Curated annotation (Swiss-Prot):
Species classification: Bacteria, Pseudomonadati, Pseudomonadota, Alphaproteobacteria, Acetobacterales
Binding of Zn(2+) 1, residues: 78, 110, 173
Substrates-to-products reaction catalysed: N-succinyl-(2S,6S)-2,6-diaminopimelate + H2O = (2S,6S)-2,6-diaminopimelate + succinate
Task of the protein: Catalyzes the hydrolysis of N-succinyl-L,L-diaminopimelic acid (SDAP), forming succinate and LL-2,6-diaminopimelate (DAP), an intermediate involved in the bacterial biosynthesis of lysine and meso-diaminopimelic acid, an essential component of bacterial cell walls.
Record EC number: 3.5.1.18
Protein's name according to its UniProt entry: Succinyl-diaminopimelate desuccinylase
Domain of life, source organism: Bacteria
Similarity comment: family membership: Belongs to the peptidase M20A family. DapE subfamily.
Keywords in alphabetical order: Amino-acid biosynthesis, Cobalt, Diaminopimelate biosynthesis, Hydrolase, Lysine biosynthesis, Metal-binding, Zinc
Enzyme class: hydrolase
Source species: Gluconacetobacter diazotrophicus (strain ATCC 49037 / DSM 5601 / CCUG 37298 / CIP 103539 / LMG 7603 / PAl5)
Note accompanying the cofactor annotation: Binds 2 Zn(2+) or Co(2+) ions per subunit.
Biological process annotations from GO: diaminopimelate biosynthetic process; L-arginine biosynthetic process; lysine biosynthetic process via diaminopimelate
Annotated binding of Zn(2+) 2, by residue: 110, 145, 358
Amino acid sequence: MTGALTPASTPALTLARDLIRAPSVTPDDGGAIGVLTAALRGLGFDVTDLPFGEGPARTPNLFARLGRSGPHLCFAGHTDVVPPGDGGWTSGPFEAALRDGCLYGRGACDMKGGIAAFVGAVARILESGRTLRGSVSLLITGDEEGPATFGTVKVLEWMAAHGQVPDFCVVGEPTNPDHLGDVIKIGRRGSLNARIVVPGIQGHVAYPHRADNPVHRLLAILSDLTARPLDQGTEWFEPSSLQVTTVDVGNEATNVIPGRATARLNIRFNDLHTGQGLADWIRGVAHVHAPGAEVTVQISGEAFRTEPTPELDMLAASIQAVTGRAPRLDTGGGTSDARFISRYCPVAEFGLVGASMHKVDEHVPVADLLALTDIYAAFLERLMG
């Protein structure tokens, strides 16, 4: 279907460029939500602005729905982007330049391009005069690259309270490592951050009996935590990973025993564990070696996996029909807002190729953007045609 269209004539490319031109570096919106709202209302969507947060600078979010019957398919994404960095861009990061068959700009693949492709798919179906059996919605946040406190989590709570929970959700994150059609994400590992502070008694290194060295106790804790693998992985998940990220004593003197020692670590864990179970384990190990240790744990998300569904099969079939690739079902990589959505409905993630995301000269081939539009349109037609 893309062969009959010039890139300049496609709603997906036009919207992608408009979104990139909105400098929505988290936590600033830069007008991106407004750009998307106008596009959706132009297609007949009912759009609800959902700002959440404290004070005047609240996080912009939106929920938009077209139709009221079932099945209800939701597309989820984010308009905020990471900072472009200090320089090195061939063209401006918010210029949305077209060059050598690619669209350049911060957010091109992560994930303004994915949002534009889905909206473009809906626009194509509506412009053809076809009707969709059911309803289509979008959950869009301006708070995914940041703390994610007042974004998707809050919108989902609002959706549940207003009878808007979908039957299935697609998140448009750039899931493909190399080629469009490589991977559908059907789950994610959980993530836990921990801070361990071991108190001691400061003193001169020549008189250790008058001091209590917290570094030795901290090393014993870290040695115990890393002594053996957490697990061997499962059918769908790679082995859980514990990585020590910082060790700090705040002491550059060579003749002083420090008064305290601090370490931070991260665990990416599979569905053999829960965040609370790992937190209890860390605290238990710490208190064996240092009864006075202070352990602070933040659980960013639990591991989850979407079981096979007809919608997942339809998405995979649509991808293969357009790209010729049978997508691999995968759970690797970092966390995403799918971890929140999985509490409400089955969710899968599929978007553009992510090789350049968060990098200087982030870009997406225009051919990939148009092909993703084809995939989303084919999926909508299979599910709701």
